[in-house]
Swiss-Prot record:
PROSITE patterns: PROKAR_LIPOPROTEIN. The keyword Cell membrane does not apply. Residues 42-72, 346-366 are annotated as: Disordered. Residues 58-69 have a biased composition (Basic and acidic residues). Residues 357-366 have a biased composition (Polar residues). Keywords: Germination, Sporulation. This is Spore germination protein GerM. GO terms for biological process: sporulation resulting in formation of a cellular spore.
Length: 366
């Protein structure tokens, strides 16, 4: 298991804004909601400008600059794009896209190599779909999105086949109106991918998993998928990577299973990191009520060797919340240690309220 070292802590650009009590972790705005459109701005034509003094001129330039910045902010909206990182993982990056009425179609267009994403592509990431691919998206009332691609869609490398399916599925299902996805090429529904022949289920969804880890699994039918979140890093930041593992069907408590997988950590060859101690354990069965799960840990959950501090690291809490809220019945997470709610975050703030899942993750600047 790879532990997160001090270099990663210094490089973090995400966690300073995290762990607000009762708040989301990265981006609190819902993906399906748009920011307010820009208001009409009236400009006054100053015919006497030549007589204005220098101070007034500077003030006018400053006002214009502020207006331009406001217009730029109000003309974009943050979207999750599932891109491929340097380790080959499919990972969400939340990036500013121009406002569009065709939001789902636009999101897929930003997955195309050499397309508009090139101007905002984060360091260490690459686009997923082959260059020059075009797409239309038809969203049905039952929550199915039909993504119909052009012939260029076939021009991908075989090793990217599953990554493409996962990227398209997870990018589209960020929208509240989309639960499942079907793929087409020029109107013809795909039952398998065109290059490597990977079978495609009738309705692709997040239940199919992402960044599948099947090493050591002899019988897939005797297991079920469970997605957990580990850490990865690039030159200037760290980010969260979803990994779908296979859990034995004899395990009926997926919440406990998820915590055990987080404590176990990623495989040594994965290139992923963790801030979890291997000694972290739940001291009682998780309790779920009204979408809130309450977890009671042993003291190994603390990120400080000083027991008086009772601090949980932001990376640990974020991984827990992202992991558990992938499960449909969980909306927020409360954490206790040996039955007591005395934890604080890295800012020293008490975690008195449950922490909810963000609508968007990995919102670090590009």
């Amino acid at each position: 298991m790879l532990k997160k070292g001090p270099a990663v802590i210094g490089a973090t650009c995400l966690t300073s804004a995290l762990l607000l009590s009762g708040c989301g972790l990265f981006q609190s705005d819902k993906a399906a909601e748009e920011i307010d459109p820009p208001q009409d701005v009236t400009f006054v034509n100053d015919e006497a400008g030549a007589n204005s003094n220098t101070t007034a001129a500077k003030k006018t330039e400053s006002e214009k600059s502020d207006t331009a910045k406001a217009d730029q902010a109000s003309s974009t909206v943050m979207r999750e794009l599932y891109l491929i990182d340097k380790n080959g993982y499919v990972v969400a990056q939340t990036l500013p896209l121009p406002k569009s009425e065709s939001t789902a179609k636009q999101a897929l267009e930003y997955l195309v190599q050499g397309g508009p994403v090139s101007e905002i592509l984060p360091n260490g990431f690459r686009a997923v779909l082959p260059a020059d691919t075009t797409v239309n998206v038809d969203i049905k009332k039952d929550g199915t999105a039909i993504a119909d691609f052009s012939n260029e869609f076939k021009n991908y490398k075989k090793e990217d086949e599953q990554k493409i399916v996962q990227s398209v599925t997870w990018t589209l299902t960020q929208f509240s109106s989309i639960d499942k996805v079907k793929l087409r090429i020029n109107g013809h529904e795909l039952k398998e991918m065109p290059v490597g022949g990977t079978p495609i289920s009738d309705d692709l969804s997040r239940k199919d998993g992402i960044n599948l880890e099947t090493a050591g699994v002899n019988d897939l039918t005797a297991t079920h998928p469970l997605t957990v979140y580990y850490l990865a890093e690039n030159e200037d930041s760290e980010y969260y990577v979803p990994v779908t593992k296979r859990i034995d069907n004899s395990e009926k408590d997926d919440i406990t299973a998820a915590i055990n997988e987080l404590a176990k950590g990623p495989s040594k060859v994965s290139g992923l990191l963790t801030d979890f101690s291997e000694d972290v354990k739940l001291v009682s069965k998780p309790k779920i009520k009204d979408g809130r799960v309450t977890l009671d840990f042993n003291q190994s959950i603390f990120g400080s060797a000083d027991e008086k501090t009772k601090m949980i690291s932001s990376e640990v809490l974020n991984s827990i919340v992202l992991t558990l809220t992938e499960q449909p019945d969980v909306k927020s997470v409360s954490v206790k240690v040996n039955g007591k709610s005395e934890l604080v975050n890295e800012k020293g703030e008490k975690l008195t309220e449950p922490v909810s899942r963000p609508s968007q993750v990995n919102t670090g600047s590009f």
